[in-house]
């Protein structure tokens, strides 16, 4: 059964958000989705790069207003 996760990282600053995202995704199955909420400006750069290098798919990012929202899918 697929589960979708919401990860609230508001108030955390680099490098904590990426470390928590990586640990969370490691415990997920392929094709599961995770919604990430963050107010750290560094995530606008870090999360797309993380997805690229770790081969996950960034389905959506909303970064015009805080909290920023990112929807990721594990795997490609």
UniProtKB/Swiss-Prot annotation:
- Is Cell membrane among this UniProt entry's keywords? no
Pathway(s) it belongs to: tRNA modification
- Which purpose does this protein serve, as stated in its record? Sulfur carrier protein involved in sulfur trafficking in the cell. Part of a sulfur-relay system required for 2-thiolation during synthesis of 2-thiouridine of the modified wobble base 5-methylaminomethyl-2-thiouridine (mnm(5)s(2)U) in tRNA. Interacts with IscS and stimulates its cysteine desulfurase activity. Accepts an activated sulfur from IscS, which is then transferred to TusD, and thus determines the direction of sulfur flow from IscS to 2-thiouridine formation. Also appears to be involved in sulfur transfer for the biosynthesis of molybdopterin.
Q: Catalytic site residues?
A: 14 (cysteine persulfide intermediate)
Q: How does it assemble?
A: Interacts with IscS.
Question: What are the alphabetically sorted keywords of the record?
Answer: Cytoplasm, tRNA processing
Write down what this protein is called.
Sulfur carrier protein TusA
